Structure formats: structure tokens, C-alpha cells
Design a protein with these regions (language model features):
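Flexible, glycine-rich loop/tail regions that form catalytic "lids" or insertion modules at the edges
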Residues: 237-238
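Ribokinase/PfkB-type carbohydrate-kinase core domain
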Residues: 1-40, 44-227, 242-256, 263-284
Length: 284
């Protein structure tokens, strides 16, 4: 079994290609004033705004702290997601999507990369042509997300031959039509898509599946400032080590990355290798 610290050292020497949509996340921090007398809405007072590089750019920010060489294929389309956020408790009130045109992504040359990492946010980047090209990758990891812009129409089942798949619980349930049953029931069907499967469970940690075996790992923190990007951090780090890692090490390192990101508002900063090692030592 390769130690967790050695896994991070292995990742540092890899050449990775990160593919996915480029998203700009904008937070407008507001102070709620109350309900106007004539309208069924809530009035707010704008305090300030903050802009972050999200989507594949945020994932790359985490990966660059660990991996020696990281390239990006983002298709050229910029998506803006503006959120109005109650400033005192960082509670999001509503969100607006803005897509500035659409460019069909070019299929990247995947030769020469140790790992190809796909962040599929369901906004059109992962075309069938792109998916058909993935078997040419030496090792392919994918995170297939469900959000308000694609609910029910961006399922992991559109992929067929991944090495590593990482989704959250709602995404796993949608992909396997498992509304009320145990989440464990979703793992074998997802195991037909990828050799290694991880389902993140929020405050309940994460569960992994490989070769018919199920592994669970509890979450590492109860402190959550902002959940945005925690799953991306989990995936960005674990995608770099999934090939060599045993399942428990994969889950522990992912949970450490997610715990660190959950304490950061938006994408203000990436998680560092030093922070990741310190978190793993703290929970050992």
C-alpha cells in the first residue's frame, strides 16, 4: 500500500490535462432589508461584490499546488454565475446564469498526459465527440455535475469507459434512478462506467467502490463556511492520485481537500499541498 504522503509525491511528478467549462463566480454581498409593502419580494442593500475564477479554473488552481505540470482545455466559452449572498452568514439568496455565446470545444490531443481530468458541469462542453475521444487518454477521471442549469440532463451514464468517476449523492441517485434506496445500491451500476467510483456524501463523508468492494470514510470537519467548490477540490486532488491509491487513501485525501475548501469563501484561494499534508496528519 502506497502511503498518502508518497501518493502526493507521485502526483507532483505527473503531467495532467484538465478539461471543462470556464466559469466566473460572482458574489454580491447584501444586507436584507425586509419585504416591501407592495411586492412579494425581499429588498436588500448591496454592500460589495467579489469575483472568482471558478469551474475548471478553480480545479486547476488546486491541482497546480500539487502537480508539476497542468494544462487546460476549456473550449473558450465563458459562463458567469452571479449569486446574491447574505453577508453575515454567507447564505445564498438567488443566482443568475449568463452565457456569453457558445463555442464548440476542440478535441484536445490527450497523448503525453499521465491523466486527463474532465470536469463536466453540463453546460455543453462535453459533447459526444469529446466523450468518444476519451479512450485515447492514458488515464481518465471525470466529475459529472448536476446543477440548476442541467438538472436531470447531465448524467454520468453518458460516459462508458472511465478509470475514475467522482459524483455526489444526488448525482449518483439520478444516474442510477435510485430515489429512495440505500446509496450503496447505486454503486454497482456506476462501477460499470468506471474502474473506481467515489460518491461524496457531504457531512457524512464519502463512499468508494472498486471490484465489488465498498469503503466508507467519515468527513473530517463540521466547520462549513461555503460549500461552493468543495466537491471540485475533492475531485481535483483525487484525480491526480486515483491510479495509484487504494480506496481508503483516496477517500481520506479527498475528504481532507474538501474539508479545507469548505472553510474558504468562494474560490478566494486554492488549497496547498502543505495544508493538505497538515490536515491528513491532524486526522491520523
Amino acid at each position: 500500500m502506497v502511503s498518502e504522503l508518497h501518493l502526493l509525491d507521485i502526483a507532483s511528478k505527473k503531467k495532467a490535462l484538465f478539461c471543462g467549462e470556464r466559469i466566473i463566480d460572482i458574489y454580491h454581498y447584501v444586507h436584507p432589508l425586509g419585504k416591501p409593502t407592495k411586492d412579494a419580494i425581499v429588498s436588500v442593500q448591496l454592500e460589495n461584490s467579489e469575483e472568482f475564477s471558478g469551474g475548471v479554473l478553480a480545479a486547476v488552481r488546486h491541482a497546480e499546488e500539487i502537480c508539476e505540470s497542468v494544462d487546460i482545455c476549456d473550449g473558450g466559452t465563458e459562463i458567469k454565475k452571479e449569486r446574491w449572498v447574505e453577508s453575515q452568514h454567507v447564505r445564498k439568496l438567488f443566482e443568475v446564469y449568463r452565457v456569453n455565446g457558445w463555442e464548440k470545444p476542440k478535441i484536445p490531443d490527450m497523448n503525453g498526459y499521465d491523466v486527463v481530468v474532465v470536469l463536466d458541469y453540463g453546460h455543453g462542453f462535453a459533447t459526444q465527440e469529446f466523450i468518444n475521444a476519451l479512450p485515447s487518454a492514458r488515464y481518465c477521471a471525470a466529475n459529472v455535475q448536476t446543477n440548476s442549469g442541467n438538472y436531470g440532463f447531465n448524467l454520468a451514464t453518458k460516459y462508458t469507459c472511465l478509470d475514475y468517476l467522482c459524483v455526489d449523492e444526488p448525482e449518483a441517485r439520478l444516474a442510477t434512478q435510485n430515489r429512495d434506496g440505500p446509496i450503496e445500491d447505486s454503486l454497482p451500476p456506476l462501477g460499470k462506467i468506471a474502474q473506481k467510483v467515489v460518491v461524496t456524501l457531504g457531512k457524512s463523508g464519502a463512499i468508494g467502490y472498486q471490484d465489488g468492494h465498498i469503503v466508507r470514510c467519515a468527513a473530517f470537519t463540521d466547520t462549513v463556511v461555503d460549500t461552493i467548490g468543495a466537491g471540485d477540490a475533492f475531485f481535483a486532488v483525487t484525480a491526480l492520485i486515483a491510479e495509484e491509491a487504494d480506496m481508503m487513501s483516496l477517500l481520506r485525501i479527498g475528504n481532507a481537500a474538501g474539508a479545507l475548501k469548505a472553510k474558504i469563501i468562494g474560490h478566494r484561494k486554492g488549497i496547498t499541498k502543505h495544508e493538505l499534508i497538515a490536515e491528513l496528519r491532524r486526522v491520523s
